[in-house]
Amino acid sequence: MGEISITKLLVIAALVVLLFGTKKLRTLGGDLGTAIKGFKKAMNDDDATAKRDADSGIQAEKLSHKE
């Protein structure tokens, strides 16, 4: 009873298409793709910022030890 078969998935997909229409689903898919791309870009920017901050911290530490 708890298993989801291929037939059930196809029926659910057909109902979703009937309820929302293909244009709305296409728009939703594009919006979702844009959101994922933005999220990945933000994660990469955060990683680059953290690495840059860590590198500048190491350089500042080297300068302070030269005194």
Curated annotation (Swiss-Prot):
Question: What is one GO cellular-component annotation here?
Answer: TAT protein transport complex
Question: Could you tell me the membrane topology recorded for this protein?
Answer: Single-pass membrane protein
Chief location: membrane
Subcellular location(s): the record lists: Cell inner membrane
Q: Which of UniProt's keywords are assigned here?
A: Cell inner membrane, Cell membrane, Membrane, Protein transport, Translocation, Transmembrane, Transmembrane helix, Transport
Q: Which domain of life is it from?
A: Bacteria
Presence of the UniProt keyword Acetylation in the record: no
* Ranges annotated as spanning the membrane: 4-21
Q: List the disulfide bonds.
A: none
UniProt-recorded Gene Ontology molecular function terms: protein transmembrane transporter activity
Biological process terms from the Gene Ontology for this record are: protein transport by the Tat complex
Functionally, this protein is described as follows: Part of the twin-arginine translocation (Tat) system that transports large folded proteins containing a characteristic twin-arginine motif in their signal peptide across membranes. TatE shares overlapping functions with TatA.
- Which HAMAP family does this entry report, sorted A to Z? TatA_E (MF_00236), TatE (MF_00903)
Q: Which family does the UniProt entry place this protein in?
A: Belongs to the TatA/E family. TatE subfamily.
What is the protein named? Answer: Probable Sec-independent protein translocase protein TatE
The organism is Citrobacter rodentium (strain ICC168)
